Curated annotation (Swiss-Prot):
Membrane-topology annotation of the record: Peripheral membrane protein
Superkingdom of the organism of origin: Bacteria
Native source organism of the sequence: Paracoccus denitrificans
Cited Gene3D superfamilies: AhpD-like
Protein name: Uncharacterized 15.0 kDa protein in nqo9-nqo10 intergenic region
Length: 134
């Protein structure tokens, strides 16, 4: 990263923190990882409402929607690690297999690149390990 880009990035972070502080002082130090620990998976009723038949009765089921979400998050690279961890957990809860999740991530290598795919696979594997421990 160049110095100019690093400076711009820091300014953007600072601006975001100031905006969060202006909207809600409690959001200044919000950490998605804390939210992940608080709510590791969404209750089945809410999952079905958001991703399933309530809003889209004839469309995609929750599992398919979550696999698509995993694909979209994978392309973002390491920017959305907590979101990917939570979505992998949700997909498993919705009936997706580890193989389906891995294939979804593999497919995204063409769009997000190999580093993004590798990072997403590492994250998914860590979620699998956590699930196996439970």
């Amino acid at each position: 990263m160049t110095d100019a880009f690093q400076k711009l990035f820091q300014q953007m972070l600072q601006s975001g923190q100031e905006m969060a502080r202006a909207f809600n002082p409690a959001l200044e130090h919000f950490d998605m990882r804390a939210m992940e620990k608080l709510v590791p998976t969404i209750p089945a009723d809410m999952l079905e409402m958001w991703f399933g038949k309530t809003f889209n009765r004839e469309g995609l089921d929750a599992k398919t929607r979550l696999l698509l979400t995993i694909g979209a998050i994978t392309v973002q690279g390491a920017l959305a690690e907590p979101q990917l961890r939570m979505t992998v957990r949700q997909a498993l809860a919705a009936g997706a297999t580890k193989r389906e999740i891995a294939e979804t991530i593999f497919q995204m290598s063409m769009f997000g690149g190999l580093p993004a795919m590798q990072k997403a696979l590492e994250i998914a594997q860590s979620v699998y390990a956590e699930e196996d421990e439970e």
